[in-house]
Amino acid sequence: MSRTLPQLCAVTTLALVLCATACKSHGGRSHEATYVSAPQTFLRDRVATVYNKVATVKNGERLDVLERTTNRRFVHVRTSNGVDGWVEQRSLVGEDVYQLFQKLARDNASSPVQAQSTTHAETNLHVAPGRDTDHLYQLPQGGKLAVLKRSFAAKALPGAAPKPKPPTAPPAKEAEKDKEADVSESTAPEPSTPAEPEAAKSGPKPILEDWLLVRDAQGRVGWVLARLVDFDIPLEIAQYSEGQRMVAFFVLTEVPDNGPKNKDDQQPAKNVPEYLVLFTEPKDGQPFDFNQIRVFTWNPRHHRYETAYREHKLNGVLPASVGREDFSKEGTLPTFTLHVRDKEGTVVERKYKLNGPIVRLLKP
């Protein structure tokens, strides 16, 4: 009897451990993740003509995949609040797309901001330049964006069939059953040096559209169609565009103004910014990001901006950057760095300094 009691205790303890382990394993079971790419959609209680709406899900929301219909048109999902329902596949993107956006954010965490901008219409944030590329987040009208880089892509011609998108990878159990599933490793498709697409042997020339790599107020990074974004160019320098397109602008330094323009002007003296501005041709699809630069300095005597430096015929590549550097006897001066392609197509770095109204190219 003395031996039976310890044995029973041991068996009971083992059973409890196994039960707890099984429960933990079941409760911690991971599901395939999917994300809402539509602005907003709803979950239905069944896949049928007549159904009830059981929940509303919003753009960017993460959902757990429970199962799919045979034709993969509908997906059975669960929200973070534990609500189950069916949703159309076209309103979702997979974990692979979400991870591409995460990679874009990591890769461009320290990229210098080229300009501030505002969306003038609702627009989608894409993983790569192009209307037919995957998108997840939708940006509202009036949203503030930091511009990081620029590229271009061909616009689909009217009547042309859109490029087919690879199907979302099914769960592991379904993949074993479906031998025809094509699952490939996703890589970030961010182009650093855009190449003009090859024209078809016959047919019209492709229409090229500029795209911008941007970061929104929530830190999300992706590509937007450039024509849906307005640059927040300071009014005092916007008037000097001369029909060219401003693609980047930076404050190099601030200088004091000499006070009122006339005796009747009671405004006190203030500091005025001096700018580096990058320009390009007013047409999408250029092989360069910018082809000229101008430095605007302030004339305190005449209370106006003047062009202190101008350089044309550049094959420029974004991003550009600004800074400050100690030049011994000259003191600490503003500097700016450009990246341009030489005649061989190699991207080289050029560094300049601003000393008063004088800009000098520094020797490498």
Kindly give the residue locations of the regions a language model identified.
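SH3/SH3-like beta-barrel superfamily modules
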Residues: 53-88, 137-227
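C-terminal motif of bacterial Sec signal peptides marking the signal peptidase cleavage site
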Residues: 19-22
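Bacterial signal peptide processing site
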Residues: 24-26
